[in-house]
Amino acid sequence: REDPKELNRIKSRFDWEEYPSDFKEKWYDYIDDEFTRREQGFCFYNNGTPTYITGTHYMYLQWSKIDVGAPDFREANRLFYIFWEACKADNRCYGMCYLKNRRSGFSFMSSAELVNQATISSDARFGILSKSGSDAKKMFTDKVVPISVNYPFFFKPIQDGMDRPKTELAYRVPASKLTRRKLESNEQLRELDGLDTTIDWKNTGDNSYDGEKLKLLAHDESGKWERPDNILNNWRV
């Protein structure tokens, strides 16, 4: 689905609020449809074959920027995402171990899911580990952050800090600086709602994220940990 050029120049909900009502009314149905597809998935004809993809898969294909631009539809990925939905729906499941070949797109797919889940979750934390701290950082800065930056404004929560952070992507309301002038004039601050959700990465180690509650942890290149670090010990953490 082609992204409307008229909406491309709108970067935040605050920009959207500045537009006239007649402009916004023209796009309400389009935006509602995108939220429906994100939640329920999408059906289409693939070379004449009726095909269903999950909402998470749709977000990856439609709204996730990867190294080659837009992702291609692959049947293997469609099955992967259906299985992933089964994992999330099963309370007995702790996650997925995915053995793959090279260039299968898993790093981008997991990055897209981190952003997808983080932007609809409140008071949550999402993490990244890889075979080394530098690899985890690279996944964060080169994959997760660009996907978040290129989300359309209607999927993009209020964000604190830089547009392209190096260590933490924080979907929360930026702290407001209380100045003497504001206190003396009793200036009313605009109340904004934020998700209070973050995505970050850590250096590789047995105790990485020890004692921290994560809603989702992406273990990239988890079979390549180098001694003395052992992913089995980290899994028990």
Model region roles, listed by residue range:
Residues R1-V237:
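Phosphate/NTP-binding elements of NTP-utilizing enzymes
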